[in-house]
Amino acid sequence: MASIPYRTALIIGAGPGISASVARQLAAEGLTVALAARDTAKLSDLVSETGAAAFAVDATDPAAVAALFKSVGERLGEPDVVIYNASARVPGPLAELDPEAVRKSLEVSAFGGFLAVQQAAQSMVPKGRGAILLTGASASVKGFARSAAFAMGKFALRGLAQSAARELGPKGIHVAHFNIDGGV
């Protein structure tokens, strides 16, 4: 792998799967890694393994996300790379889904992504560099039965990534949305 031209990465929605694999690779490349999740206890093994720092965050709370970026900046340096990996699934038949559960799912998958991208942009634009990566799924391009809430959130996240890339790319910020299906 080519050398990564950044120093600090923040992964929001950290857990044992995709984000853990990414954290390991980034740490191996010499980046300082910040892991953010609702429950940091589940990150203790990954923190020990990679030397990453763990931060608690509710990705749907604007004040909490702003505080996360401030804390990471003060403790590790402003993140040059921000990866948004949080999502919430509410599987089931459309006619039977709890509307409030669907709303919460959308808040995590889409609104939380917006909050992360907004904070990253506020930090990166003045420097004229950085990378914002949003994890998607094939559900972001094709809905599946019994997964309406997940597809809605991933479609929205893809739209956010496309808009952010067009707005922030000319300012030196790389924005990408990539689909990863299956467990890691």
What are these regions (language model features)?
Residues 15-16:
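Conserved glycine-rich cofactor-binding loop
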Residues 31-44:
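Conserved glycine-rich Rossmann-like NAD(P)H-binding loop of the short-chain dehydrogenase/reductase
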Residues 93-94, 101-106:
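Substrate-binding pocket helix/loop in short-chain dehydrogenase/reductase
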Residues 117-118, 162:
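A short, exposed helix-loop element centered on a Lys and neighboring polar residues
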Residues 131-156, 162, 169:
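Catalytic loop of short-chain dehydrogenase/reductase
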